[in-house]
């Protein structure tokens, strides 16, 4: 068994039958789009629920209600009313209560996605709130983003570098981003995606199945280490 898989097992509470996946990243990077695409692909195979975080609105929850295949009652918006860091890390009580309510409502739930409010590169989830974490950045922010570091870049279980199709328009060199991500991640996986066209979405799903759900499947070839 790899150290990565062992770590995932240790982080997961084996007394429950669901996994909590935290999804964080800067505003506009593609967090909500990732969850929307994922739920469309896996909702027929797994029982899924989603918790979203916005400071003053429930815009992300409303988007997912309109665009994902999940029933509205499986999507819950949390209005944090303040710094998005606090609601997922220092005081995650609102989100923990939302998760408890959701899994009580749907005892068959296998995956709970928890989307943070849009934040910078320092967002991290409380280990009580998320079993595994995905951090989303995008190419439009510039090729320098991976080497800027921060906990989201260096500590997340999976780094998603989204909007690869925009690289020619913003002067970003994907090979430079790959080199820097390898250096900053130190062996932890990352993946390039174009979520608008679902490019490498299957790789994210494969990572979830292998390292979050602990299925006996091959590591996706699109993952980079």
UniProtKB/Swiss-Prot annotation:
GO cellular component: cytoplasm
SUPFAM superfamilies from the UniProt entry: P-loop containing nucleoside triphosphate hydrolases
Chief location of this protein within or outside the cell: cytoplasm
Keywords: Chaperone, Cytoplasm, GTP-binding, Nickel insertion, Nucleotide-binding
GO biological process, one term: urea catabolic process
Domain of life, source organism: Bacteria
Binding site for GTP: 25-32
InterPro entries: CobW/HypB/UreG_nucleotide-bd, P-loop_NTPase, UreG
Matching HAMAP family: UreG
Family to which the UniProt record says this protein belongs: Belongs to the SIMIBI class G3E GTPase family. UreG subfamily.
PANTHER family per the UniProt record, alphabetical: UREASE ACCESSORY PROTEIN G
Protein name: Urease accessory protein UreG
């Amino acid at each position: 068994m790899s150290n990565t898989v062992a770590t995932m097992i240790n982080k997961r509470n084996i007394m429950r039958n669901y996994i909590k996946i935290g999804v964080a990243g800067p505003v506009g990077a593609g967090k909500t789009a990732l969850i929307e695409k994922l739920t469309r692909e896996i909702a027929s195979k797994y029982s899924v629920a989603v918790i979203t975080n916005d400071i003053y609105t429930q815009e992300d929850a409303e988007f997912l209600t309109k665009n994902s295949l999940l029933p509205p009652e499986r999507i819950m918006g949390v209005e944090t009313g303040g710094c998005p860091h606090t609601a997922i890390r220092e005081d995650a009580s609102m989100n923990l209560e939302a998760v408890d309510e959701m899994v009580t409502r749907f005892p068959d739930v296998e995956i709970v996605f928890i989307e943070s409010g849009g934040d910078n590169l320092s967002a991290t989830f409380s280990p009580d709130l998320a079993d595994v974490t995905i951090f989303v950045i995008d190419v439009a922010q510039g090729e320098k983003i991976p080497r800027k570091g921060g906990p989201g870049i260096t500590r997340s279980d999976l780094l998603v570098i989204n909007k690869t199709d925009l690289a020619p328009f913003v002067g970003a060199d994907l090979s430079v981003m790959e080199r820097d991500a390898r250096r900053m991640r130190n062996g932890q996986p990352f993946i390039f995606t174009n979520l608008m066209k679902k490019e490498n979405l299957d790789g994210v799903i494969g990572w979830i199945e292998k390292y979050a759900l602990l299925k006996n499947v091959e590591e996706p070839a699109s993952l980079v280490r």
